[in-house]
Amino acid sequence: MSIRIIPQDELGSSEKRTADMIPPLLFPRLKNVYNRRAERLRELAENNPLGDYLRFAALIAHAQEVVLYDHPLEMDLTARIKEANDQGKPPLDIHVLPRDKHWQKLLHSLIAELKPEMNGPALAVIENLEKASEQELEQMASALFASDFASVSSDKAPFIWAALSLYWAQMASLIPGKARAEYGEARQYCPVCGSMPVSSMVQIDTTQGLRYLHCNLCETEWHVVRVKCSNCEQSRDLHYWSLENEQAAVKAESCGDCGTYLKILYQEKDPKVEAVADDLASLVLDARMEQEGFARSSINPFLFPGEGE
């Protein structure tokens, strides 16, 4: 199954009703998303061996919230949606969508917001980014989108990605239209931008019991049925791992067919779980999965692979 975004004026009345039954896509609702992430990161930092880094990530998330409202984005994406729909491509495809200078404005605002909170190596990193040329910043952005992580140091990547993520999330929140699920290409990548998931979540409320993958870039969530590998769509050899017990709110879903795993979070076990924060706070589970021979099929926006990984 794949997910395609249909312009609003091309949806018939029956399709509109169907699209409202099980939403294939949940576009980002940006109000307080970064503050909630920052709060969860600070909460999870207590008694966590990674506490210092979780608090560092919380500072970036809080800065994203501030910059989001300081630099709103106005953009008409109607033509872009129709063009992408005709081409069968994600409307905000990271591999083809031209970037304007808005994202660099966001980056410099993030740096200004974070400088008073940083010291030592972290301060040196953002000061280095502050001095980088527009061309150098674009090269780093292109490398990250191409998964060329060896070309961008792992200490710079979270700051670059934080600005790109803000930009793409702002655009995704402005998309006009509905989404429709249809048979086609596998959907292990975000249908809006083509980036990777950070984790998946079994939700409560109006989407009770449904699993959605959460994009690590544009914050969109897309529906993938449970008990199916989100990477290869097989269901023959799935296993669920946790560091606690069967009632754990954070588990890893491994697939013996493709040899990968993805975290799955359960809101019914803990309503406060957050896609990015809880994934980052459970790196001990990642270490266990690596010991078992599984490769991660996702990337956390605060933890990028280094050279040689």
UniProtKB/Swiss-Prot annotation:
InterPro entries: FdhE-like_sf, FdhE_C, FdhE_central, FdhE_N, Formate_DH_accessory
Chief site of localization: cytoplasm
Gene3D superfamilies xrefs: FdhE-like domain (3.90.1670.10)
GO molecular function per UniProt: ferric iron binding
One term under GO cellular component: cytosol
Keyword tags: Cytoplasm
Subcellular location: Cytoplasm
Protein's UniProt keywords contain Cytoplasm: yes
A Pfam short name: FdhE_central
Recorded superkingdom: Bacteria
GO BP of this protein: protein maturation
Record NCBIfam families: FdhE (TIGR01562), PRK03564.1 (NF002925)
Physiological role: Necessary for formate dehydrogenase activity.
Similarity remark: Belongs to the FdhE family.
Name under which the protein is recorded: Protein FdhE
Organism in which the protein naturally occurs: Salmonella paratyphi A (strain AKU_12601)
